[in-house]
Amino acid sequence: MSMVTARRRARLQSILAAQVAAAVTAQTAALEIDELRLYPVREPVSGRAWTVVRVKTRSGLAGYGECAYASSKDLAAAQRFWAGRPATSYASAPADSPLAGAVDMALLDIVGKASKAPVYRLLGGPTRSKARAFTSVEGAGAAVKRAIEAGYRAVGLRVPAPAARNQGQAYQLELRKLVETVRSQAADFVLEGAGLLTPGDAASVAAAIERWHPLWFDEPTTIGSLETLRKIADESVAPLGFGRDIRHAGVFQDLLRAGCLDVARPDILHFGITGSRRIAALAETYYVAVAPCHEGGPIATAAALHLAASLPNFFIQHIPLPAAAEDRAMRAQLAGGDLERVKDGFASLPNGPGLGITVNEAVLEKYHAA
């Protein structure tokens, strides 16, 4: 190679490098976070409330997420932290912020839109083409029938709250009647304890329901003594699920080490997609399945479905199904009517860029929660 040719090649390489660097710099600047905004919303009939977080970049690209609640003070702190940072830094969110999960969803939404790819592809998926779903019902009978007609093949049943400790046979008969309403519909069920039972009552219920093969017994009692939870797990083959009220990932690790967790349930409104994936990775090393908890709106549903499509140990996803038609219509108007539609027990994955939904901000304003 002649000296002239070498110089020309070096010059060409430097020009190309400068062009690539300029393009990367421009793209990074376009993804710099400029503004965060809160939209507290509430379903008109049930009163279920959550907070939508919109994150905008300097180029005008917007992403959306959800959290349970955030104050103006929380928003100001998040604005100070995120302003000027690139949307690609979603994994660095401060875990103690109430907005952490929502901002995580919103930033992944932005990165997906900028990349023209669904979020699950950014996360290495899809691991499946659809996600199994269940919904919680209040009471039995008509509520279970409504869920089945809506396409669900699994429901969550709230355990009857005992009037006192050690209810004995009468309580077991009441529980049996509740479960029979689901079995008569040929549906699977999750028994939701919601931490209402004492450890003794929880152990008794766990032993009683194992014959009916529940998907799992959710929050059978409060998370206190790991030895007590281990005893409940050892005395019944009914799988145990925890996570609805857990706010620190280390608690999942403690439960896994103690051998008293069969279904990990990180709250996607708190942990977001990234935090939930970290917990799922930890659970996978113990051969434990993941069924994320979700009590928010349709934006979180979209995030949960992308999460499901990225997890090898995903089990089933909870999706809220309001009893009132007005509430269901509000959710459909907010993010698209097909998003939360379930067919034969499965929800379809959103396939558009980012979270794959178009958020109607007029609906956010209409159902603003004072």
What do these predicted regions represent?
Residues 129-236:
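Metal-dependent enolase-superfamily TIM-barrel catalytic cores that perform enediolate-based chemistry
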Residues 56-118:
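Metal- or metallocofactor-binding catalytic centers and their adjacent structured scaffolds
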